[in-house]
Curated annotation (Swiss-Prot):
Family as reported in the entry's similarity comment: Belongs to the ribonuclease III family.
Protein's name in the database: Ribonuclease 3
One GO location term (cellular component): cytosol
Active site annotation, chain numbering: 44, 116
Known catalytic reactions: Endonucleolytic cleavage to 5'-phosphomonoester
Binding site for Mg(2+): 40, 113, 116
Residue ranges constituting the RNase III domain according to the UniProt record: 5-127
Organism this protein belongs to: Xanthomonas campestris pv. campestris (strain ATCC 33913 / DSM 3586 / NCPPB 528 / LMG 568 / P 25)
Localization per record: Cytoplasm
Signal peptide: none
Enzyme Commission code(s) on record: 3.1.26.3
Length: 226
């Protein structure tokens, strides 16, 4: 399965000045060299730095333990694989015949590695500031949905308390779809408010995470209208 050059408007959000970096980031070792393992190594460090910085800035009251747990949740293999699917990386990966036949383009580990490799490719292509600007939006739904320690309430709790304070009906959460293999489930959920009328959708590797993401989006809608 060969990669396609990303164009403007594609989910990744970056047009590469050096297409060779993109090609390498999407080439699994089963397809020969140069493959993406060195880029994956570099990207792992960059992702950890970006997420650590984002959490440090966004949750000033959270202690070290809460920040560490939050970062671990955001950069774990399953979470990165969800991003890989959102970016449609599976259909762009270059895999050897064996990996292709065994469904490697759907495997969490391969997708997560490709995400890290692409982060490194963006960094090498255009530097850290641009890399941050491109990559952080990939994590934004999960950042917004993640409860960080006792200092921060999760989006579902915040939304419920906002509605209760105004004596308004509580939100309803509806499962839109559930897809993927047992080891790579993807849940698609809607959060629906009766009053004020609002609706948002969220996706995640568990129904809880999908509901948190949907609630976070509804909160953002309410904030923009006040």
């Amino acid at each position: 399965m060969s990669n396609r050059t990303f164009q403007r408007g594609d989910p990744i959000g970056h047009a590469f000045a050096d297409p060779g970096l993109l090609a390498q980031a999407l080439r699994h070792r089963s397809a020969g060299t140069p493959h993406n393992e060195r880029l994956e190594f570099l990207g792992d460090g960059i992702v950890n730095l970006l997420i650590a910085e984002a959490l440090y800035q966004r949750w000033p009251k959270a202690d070290e333990g809460a920040l560490t747990r939050a970062r671990a949740e955001l950069v774990r293999e399953g979470a990165l694989a969800v991003i890989g699917r959102t970016l449609n990386l599976g259909e762009r990966l270059t895999l050897g015949p064996g990996e292709l036949k065994s469904g490697g383009h759907r495997r969490d580990s391969i997708l997560a590695d490709a995400v890290e490799a692409i982060v490194a490719a963006i960094y090498l292509d255009c530097g850290f500031e641009r890399c941050r600007a491109v990559v952080l939006p990939w994590f934004e739904p999960s950042l917004a949905a993640l409860p960080v320690g006792k200092a921060e309430k999760d989006p579902k709790t915040r939304l419920q308390e906002w509605l209760q304070a105004r004596q308004l009906p509580l939100p309803q959460y509806a499962l839109i779809s559930e897809s993927g293999d047992e080891h790579a489930k993807q849940f698609h959920v809607a959060c629906i408010l009766e009053q004020p009328a609002a609706r948002a959708e969220g996706q995640g590797t568990s129904r809880r995470l999908a509901e948190q993401q949907a609630a976070a989006t509804v909160i953002a809608q309410l904030d923009s209208n006040t």
